[in-house]
Every structure is written in C-alpha cells, then in structure tokens.
C-alpha cells in the first residue's frame, strides 16, 4: 500500500478536490493471490512476493522508487524470512529496484503486522517526517522450516534429536496464542459469534465493492 500526503500526490490525480492538503491518502494498493498451505506458492520466498507488490504498486501510479521516502514492512513468520535474510524490508526493496540508500523498517506484530506497517506510514506522513511511504506485508507459512534445537550446534552425545515445528502454535511458549486470547476477550466483552460474522461479512462486501470498482 502506498500512502502519501495530499500535497505530495496531487500530481497523480490532478490538483483540486475537497480534501485538506494535510490529509493522508492511499494512492495505490495491490496484493498477491492467496495460496493453500503447501500449494502453488510454497516454493516462493515471501521476500519475492513482497518485492513483486512493491514494484506493481509503484507502476500503477507511475511513481519512481526514489520518490518513496520510507518503507514499513510487516512480517510475522521470522523463521521463513530467516532462510533468506534477517532484514526482509531491506532485501525486498532492493529486489524491487528501490535505491540502495532507501530507508526501510521491518516489524513483527503477529497478525497485525501489515496493517501496523500501513499505520506507521500514516503516522510518519501525519507528523510531517515524510510525504510518501509504503506499507508492506508478506509471509509464506508454507516455507517455514523445521527447527533444530540449539544444543545440536554443539553436539548431542546421547539420545534422540528432535525437530521443532515453528508453525505449531506459531511458536508461542509460556502464553496463549492470539486466537485463544481473542476468544477469551470475546467472552469477556459479550461479542457473539453472530457479531463476528456480521463484521466478517461487511469486510467481504467492502472488498467485493473495491474489487468491482478496480481498486484492487
């Protein structure tokens, strides 16, 4: 998702309009298709998927990489990106042919990572620090590796060696997965399944409308 101040993006859509020039607007937004676990996308690194959408989101509005001041990149499965790099934001922007001196930040906020990336871009623009930013989110759970315990590096003299599945419980140790906490919060605040279904339905209808209008 590319965000920009009203002043910065005026040239993309023509000057004028009723919006205040201090407003932050979404200029361009794209996404890759979904794939099933172990499906057609299982061998494609998430960094490649991230680079793909960065290139396309810029192409659609004819914006050059050097015009983007910061990229915020959300990724919630560090075990998968770790197969390629510990700094996915940097790698994805370079693969998307952004300038080598481009500023980027990687963040992990579990399921909210990509929306948090968009939010940080919004905040930076609103604070007057930048005028154009990218909010990106990419991961490929199908490529998450099985983990060898740390002691294996220094040798195992006796007994079996286990492999850990980083996706099982998404690696949560000592506290509940987010899905369990979400269920408990719903009970605490009296949010029924019907309430949640209505919210999900409304979200799907908004996407359907946006897709029909060519926004995605």
Predicted feature locations:
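Conserved catalytic cysteine-centered active-site region
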Residues: 71, 75-132, 172-178
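Flexible glycine-/small-residue-enriched beta->alpha junction loops
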Residues: 126, 131-185
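N-terminal extracellular/periplasmic Venus flytrap/periplasmic-binding protein-like
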Residues: 31-32, 43-52, 60, 195-216
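Short, Lys/Arg-enriched N-terminal segments with co-localized hydrophobic residues
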Residues: 1-18
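Acidic, glycine-rich active-site loops and adjacent beta-strand->loop/helix elements
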Residues: 30-33, 74-79, 109-113, 137-144, ...
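Condensing-enzyme catalytic core mediating Claisen C-C bond formation in acyl metabolism
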Residues: 19-44, 56, 187
């Amino acid at each position: 998702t590319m965000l920009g101040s009203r002043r910065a993006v005026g040239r993309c859509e023509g000057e004028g309009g009723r919006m205040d020039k201090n407003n932050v607007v979404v200029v361009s937004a794209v996404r890759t298709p979904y794939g099933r676990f172990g499906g057609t996308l299982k061998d494609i690194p998430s960094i490649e998927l991230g680079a793909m959408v960065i290139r396309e989101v810029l192409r659609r509005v004819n914006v050059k990489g050097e015009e983007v001041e910061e990229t915020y990149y959300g990724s919630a499965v560090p075990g998968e990106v770790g197969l390629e790099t510990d700094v996915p934001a940097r790698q994805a922007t370079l693969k998307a042919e952004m300038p080598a001196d481009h500023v980027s930040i990687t963040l992990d906020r579990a399921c909210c990572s990509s929306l948090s990336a968009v939010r940080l871009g919004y905040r930076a623009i609103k604070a007057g620090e930048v005028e154009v930013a990218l909010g990106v989110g990419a991961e490929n759970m199908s490529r998450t590796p099985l983990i060898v315990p740390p002691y294996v590096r220094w040798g195992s003299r006796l007994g079996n060696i286990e492999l850990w599945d980083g996706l099982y419980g998404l690696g949560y140790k000592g506290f509940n997965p987010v899905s369990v906490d979400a269920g408990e919060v719903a009970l605490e605040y009296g949010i029924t399944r019907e309430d949640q279904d209505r919210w999900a339905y409304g979200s799907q209808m908004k996407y359907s409308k946006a897709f029909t209008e060519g926004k995605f």
